[in-house]
Amino acid sequence: MATGKIVQIIGAVIDVEFPQDAVPKVYDALKVETGLTLEVQQQLGGGVVRCIALGTSDGLKRGLKVENTNKAIEVPVGTKTLGRIMNVLGEPIDEAGPIGEEERWTIHRAAPSYEEQANSTELLETGIKVIDLIAPFAKGGKVGLFGGAGVGKTVNMMELIRNIAIEHSGYSVFAGVGERTREGNDFYHEMKDSNVLDKVSLVYGQMNEPPGNRLRVALTGLTMAEKFRDEGRDVLFFVDNIYRYTLAGTEVSALLGRMPSAVGYQPTLAEEMGVLQERITSTKTGSITSVQAVYVPADDLTDPSPATTFAHLDSTVVLSRNIASLGIYPAIDPLDSTSRQLDPLVVGQEHYDVARGVQKTLQRYKELKDIIAILGMDELSEDDKLVVARARKIERFLSQPFHVAEVFNSVPGKFVPLKETIRGFKGILAGEYDHIPEQAFYMAGSIDEVVERANKM
């Protein structure tokens, strides 16, 4: 093993000098004598390599010895990782002893070839009305939850995990990328209480960790998911939050000497996103269904980071601050959310017609809002008054109590089957429930519950 020494330290970026005939390759893992792991990013010439620290660089000094491991970072994979919490290097952080893995895989892998890839049109039922109706998920597809700060990305993701992981008997991998430690803790206990912890591998690189950890932790989680997929399983891969992955790249990019591009992001933004997203795919042996939370800075969907993510997804679920301010949760915007699966050939004609009917009614209501604000409801035609009444019922019926939010509001969560969702909205559009007051539709599960409520009013 070649040995070098540290010659420069700037934050998370460290330069190491090696003998000219033993310069490490890009992505090789280096070990500092203090125990810190570095990953080679650039070769600067003269035997010097520039690395990112996968851990804090506090206490390092020039002249410390560094050993080249001659291989990239490797992490444990396989069933031994289930029920465990690990860091970016695959080391356990749950104080439950060693992982005891039988195999380790490198975190840098090629995406499956074009011939190996497979696509599926099988739907994945989530039990969340607005998602199943407007932006249905495909098994083996990629889903993005877009939203600004505090509109409910993590709660939506936890509900999806709870519903899908309980209904779906396969394995899941959760990568916490630059999120709050508190959320990681909540998530762990949620999984434990739902008795699905033994089917989930948890990998965390939290907000308080150096950018190197946050940049690589998504790849660590993905590698574990790929192993399950290559064994012929259908695996769920959850990432919270993709934006922090981009941000970690931005933090180290300037230190690596790259010129910033639009809005100060790294010039390699699209490539870094592509490297991660192209690996999250389904093959002929197994599938990876991924759900990714995407933070939207300042609620601006045209920001380069969320805009780059959009291109890779099959379904986009957009959370809206306006809907959250009305007290309607989940605060999903039915006019902004899209899915490639919403096609009569995939979901069937009835589902397609109901979904488009709901969007058409809500869009008409949106257009009428200006007239209502200036002239009032009385100036509308009878037809328009009916559209407004139905749209307001639809808006409220799109809300639903979540199981994971039960601890906060004491309202029992509801899982609504897709058939019930379609039946309910079809009835509202057909005018079957015009006699029911709109407040009966708020935070209800199925349409039968609404009718029952209305009878008690």
UniProtKB/Swiss-Prot annotation:
**What GO cellular component is one of the record's annotations?**
proton-transporting ATP synthase complex
Catalyses which reaction(s): ATP + H2O + 4 H(+)(in) = ADP + phosphate + 5 H(+)(out)
Task: Cite the SUPFAM superfamilies for this sequence.
Answer: C-terminal domain of alpha and beta subunits of F1 ATP synthase, N-terminal domain of alpha and beta subunits of F1 ATP synthase, P-loop containing nucleoside triphosphate hydrolases
Keywords assigned by UniProt, alphabetized: ATP synthesis, ATP-binding, Cell inner membrane, Cell membrane, CF(1), Hydrogen ion transport, Ion transport, Membrane, Nucleotide-binding, Translocase, Transport
What's a Gene Ontology MF term here? ATP binding
Which SMART domains does the annotation name?
A: AAA
Q: What are the binding positions for ATP in this chain?
A: 147-154
Q: Write down a Pfam family by its short name.
A: ATP-synt_VA_C
UniProt-annotated location(s): Cell inner membrane
Broad class of where this protein is predominantly found: membrane
| Presence of the UniProt keyword NADP in the record | no
Its membrane topology is listed as: Peripheral membrane protein
Per the UniProt record, which EC number(s) apply here? 7.1.2.2
> Do you know which InterPro entries this protein is assigned to?
AAA+_ATPase, ATP-synt_VA_C, ATP_synth_F1_bsu, ATPase_a/bsu_AS, ATPase_alpha/beta_chains, ATPase_F1/V1/A1_a/bsu_N, ATPase_F1/V1/A1_a/bsu_N_sf, ATPase_F1/V1/A1_a/bsu_nucl-bd
Record's function text: Produces ATP from ADP in the presence of a proton gradient across the membrane. The catalytic sites are hosted primarily by the beta subunits.
Q: Which family is this sequence assigned to?
A: Belongs to the ATPase alpha/beta chains family.
Quote the subunit structure annotation.
Answer: F-type ATPases have 2 components, CF(1) - the catalytic core - and CF(0) - the membrane proton channel. CF(1) has five subunits: alpha(3), beta(3), gamma(1), delta(1), epsilon(1). CF(0) has three main subunits: a(1), b(2) and c(9-12). The alpha and beta chains form an alternating ring which encloses part of the gamma chain. CF(1) is attached to CF(0) by a central stalk formed by the gamma and epsilon chains, while a peripheral stalk is formed by the delta and b chains.
Q: Kindly give the NCBIfam families that the UniProt entry links to this protein.
A: atpD
- Protein's name according to its UniProt entry: ATP synthase subunit beta
This chain's source organism reads Glaesserella parasuis serovar 5 (strain SH0165)
Give the lineage: Bacteria, Pseudomonadati, Pseudomonadota, Gammaproteobacteria, Pasteurellales
